[in-house]
Every structure is written in structure tokens, then in C-alpha cells.
From Swiss-Prot:
GO terms for cellular component: chloroplast thylakoid membrane; photosystem II reaction center. The lineage of its organism: Eukaryota, Viridiplantae, Streptophyta, Embryophyta, Tracheophyta. HAMAP family: PSII_PsbZ. The chain crosses the membrane at residues 8-28, 41-61. This is Photosystem II reaction center protein Z. Gene3D superfamilies: Photosystem II PsbZ, reaction centre (1.10.287.740). It is a multi-pass membrane protein. Keywords: Chloroplast, Membrane, Photosynthesis, Photosystem II, Plastid, Reaction center, Thylakoid, Transmembrane, Transmembrane helix. Belongs to the PsbZ family. May control the interaction of photosystem II (PSII) cores with the light-harvesting antenna, regulates electron flow through the 2 photosystem reaction centers. PSII is a light-driven water plastoquinone oxidoreductase, using light energy to abstract electrons from H(2)O, generating a proton gradient subsequently used for ATP formation. It comes from the Eukaryota. Pfam families: Ycf9. PSII is composed of 1 copy each of membrane proteins PsbA, PsbB, PsbC, PsbD, PsbE, PsbF, PsbH, PsbI, PsbJ, PsbK, PsbL, PsbM, PsbT, PsbY, PsbZ, Psb30/Ycf12, at least 3 peripheral proteins of the oxygen-evolving complex and a large number of cofactors. It forms dimeric complexes.
Length: 62
């Protein structure tokens, strides 16, 4: 169970880092938002899902 928690936290950190870099690049590029809107929404949905997964796993471990 601890390994699953650690992997979920690592995935959350990796997703956060990727979104931290990619979202400003998408907004700064011309026509970037209209072309990459689905990618940004998918990444944000993945991030929200990982936050809930980490919270659930944390409550099971503690």
C-alpha cells in the first residue's frame, strides 16, 4: 500500500511539474489555447484525480 501511495505522490508531482511548464507556454503561444485546449483540460483532470487518489491512499495508510 505504501508503494502505491509513493507512486501516486510521484505522479502528482510529475504532473504538477509538467502543467507548471506547459500551461504558460500554451497561453503565450499564438493560437495555442484553441489548439491545445483538450490537452490542458486532460492534464488538469488528471491532476485533480491524482489529488483525490493521494488523499484516499493517505487516509488508508494513516
Amino acid at each position: 500500500m505504501i508503494i502505491a501511495f509513493q507512486l501516486a505522490v510521484f505522479a502528482l508531482i510529475a504532473t504538477s511539474s509538467i502543467l507548471l511548464i506547459s500551461v504558460p507556454v500554451v497561453f503565450a503561444s499564438p493560437d495555442g489555447w484553441s489548439n491545445n485546449k483538450n490537452v490542458v483540460f486532460s492534464g488538469t483532470s488528471l491532476w485533480i484525480g491524482l489529488v483525490f487518489l493521494v488523499a484516499i491512499l493517505n487516509s488508508l495508510i494513516s
